[in-house]
Amino acid sequence: MRRCLYALVGILLTASYASLPSYAQEMQWEDYAPRSTLVVEENPVTSAKYPFVDAHAHQRRIGEMSEAQVDELVAEMDALNMAVMVNLSGGSGEDLLQKVENTERYAPGRFVHYANIDFDTVDDPDFGEKAAAQLERDVANGAKGLKIFKSLGMEITYEDGTRVKTDDPHLAPIWEKAGELGIPVLIHTGDPAPFWQPQDRYNERWFELKQYPNRKRPPEPSWETIMGDHWNLIRQHPNTTFISAHLSWLGNDLGRLGELLDEMPNMYTELGAVIGEIGRQPRTAREFFIEYQDRILMGKDSFAPEEYHVYFRIFETDDEYFPYYRLRHAFWSMYGMDLPDEVLRKVYYKNALAIIPGIDASLFPDE
C-alpha cells in the first residue's frame, strides 16, 4: 500500500512539473531578465543638462551623407543636447577631406574629424616619417586629432611576424608630430582584462565571450604587457596630449587609473562603452570624477540615442538600481553619482574645448 502511495505521489509531481511552461522548467542564463520590484524615486534624463561634446564617436559614412541624412543626425544630436560629435573614423587623404567638406557644408561646426594611420607599409624604414607627413597634410585638410585603433599593439605585425608594439620607436615621429601640431591622440589599446582570463563561471565577461568568441585573447602577449606598452608610449612623449580610450580599461580599478593620471599630466581619458563600470560604484566614482575633473571627457563610442540617457542619469542624478542597456557589458544595475555642476561642465564640454582644437566655443555656455 505504501509503495503504491509513493508511486502515486511521484506520478502527480511529474505531471505537475510537466504542466509548467517550458521557460519555467529550464532557462538560459542570458534569458533571465527579472523585473525589479524595488520602489524608489526615478529621474530619467533624456537630454544632458549642458551641451556636450561626444569625444568618442564613429561616423564612417558621413562623407557620403546627403543633406537630409546629416539633418536627421543633427536633429538626434539636438534632442540629446549634443553640441559637437567627434568622428574618430575620419580616415586620411581624400576620404578625410570629403568628410570634412560634407559636414561643413551641411552642418558647420557640429562635427570634428580625427585622422587615422594606415599601417600597411609599416615595414618601410621611413614609415614613421612618412606617416607623420601625411598626418600634417590631414591636419591642413581639417583633421583636429588622431585616432589609433586597437589593431596597433595586438594585430599589426612586421613581415617577420613580430608584433608592432604601441611604443615601438619606429612610430615615434607620428606622436612627436601630433604634439608639434597641437592635436590630441585618442588611442584605443587592448580590451577588457577578462578577455585574457579563463572563460569560466568566475569571468565577468563570460556572456560577451559567449556572444563573440573571437574576442577571447591568447595568454601572450598578456593584458598587462599590451597596456604597459600603451602607458609607456604616453610617458615617452610628454609634449603630446593622449586620450586613453575606454578609461584605459581601468574603470574597475579607478585607484590605479588615478595613479597613472597623477604620473602623466599629458594623459586624459574618456568613457566610451565603460559607463557600466562607473554605475556600479557611485561613491568611489564620484570621488574620482571630482578629483580628476580636468582629465575626463564624455565619450560614448556607438551612436544609439537612447543609450546616452543612461550616461546622463549616472552623471546627473542620485537614482538607485536602474537598468543598463547591454547585458554583455553589465549584468548589474546602475546608480547615479549626482555630480556637481562644475564637474558636469568639465566632463561635458570644458575639457574637450581645452584639448581639441577648432571646436566652436560659442555652442557652449560662457560660464
What spans do the regions from the language model cover?
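Bacterial N-terminal signal peptides
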Residues: 6-19
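An N-terminally biased module of ancient metal coordination in phosphate/nucleic-acid-related enzymes
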Residues: 23-109
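Acidic (Asp/Glu)-rich catalytic clusters
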Residues: 44-47, 74-79, 98-111, 133-143, ...
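Acidic-and-aromatic substrate-binding clefts and catalytic sites of carbohydrate-active enzymes
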Residues: 60-69, 87-97, 120-129, 156, ...
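Active-site gating/metal-coordination segments in enzymes
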Residues: 26-29, 34, 96-213
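H/E-rich (His + Asp/Glu) clusters that bind or coordinate divalent metals
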Residues: 218, 224-232, 237-367
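Hydrophobic faces of well-ordered beta-strands that scaffold small-molecule active sites
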Residues: 53-57, 84-87, 112-115, 146-148, ...
